[in-house]
Amino acid sequence: MTHGTIHSVESCGTVDGPGIRFIVFTQGCPLRCQYCHNADTWEFGCGRSVSATAIIEEAEGYRSFFEATGGGITFSGGEPLAQPEFLEAALREAKQKGLHTVIDTAGSVVPKNIDQILDHTDLVLLDIKHIDDATCRILTGRSNANTLAFAKRLADRNIPVWIRHVLVPGLTMTETFLRQTGEFIRTLGNVERVEVLPYHQLGVYKWEALGLDYPLKDVLPPSAEDATAAQELLTSYLS
């Protein structure tokens, strides 16, 4: 029986894929995003150990909500692709049970069994941290090369994708970078939706609890007008 390590679950999520969803937050992430609101999911080797079978059985308790709303199960994190064997096993069992499956990922980790994982995935929420590699390294500690290559792989397999992009003043919120992101999205052909996520500071207390210095403490969230403009700009590249 395949086991994984999770941070927590959310029984009735409504923002990580279509419908009402059972969200599994896996434990462990190789990125160190400066705006991360779940810094407590970074560390590997801690969290709750659970079998793929057990987590799908737990999700099945909400089947009536899924069927009424077109929902299902979403694997988020942390970085779910950092636990590839567990993810593949859980997704396989979910599909065997007839559940709609979503992976919420930054695509920075591409495991050897990625094609087997995608065989059981209905939708990918792909977070493009930054289209510029140098800035991405500053923002996350990692290159964006794997993310962009993963996006192209998803396009080649014609797996539906929702692109996510966190709007951070001074880092991601420039027209040049937004247009470059849009031009990349336009090349893919399988992107159903773009979601601009306005930067916020709701996770600062987690950094403080972990004894970490929050690097963006002086950065204010974008205005509603700026967020709307960015959303409209990126969405225009889907047409």
Task: Give the ranges of each region predicted by the language model.
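Canonical Radical SAM [4Fe-4S] cluster-binding loop centered on the CxxxCxxC motif
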Residues: 2, 8-10, 14-50
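Short glycine-enriched, charge-decorated loop/helix-capping segments at active-site entrances
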Residues: 40-44, 137-143, 211-219
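Conserved AdoMet/S-adenosylmethionine-binding subsite of the radical SAM
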Residues: 56, 60-72, 76-77, 81-202, ...
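N-terminal/domain-start segments enriched in small and hydrophobic, helix-friendly residues
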Residues: 6, 30, 41-43, 154-161, ...
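Auxiliary Fe-S-binding modules of radical SAM enzymes
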Residues: 1-13, 169-239
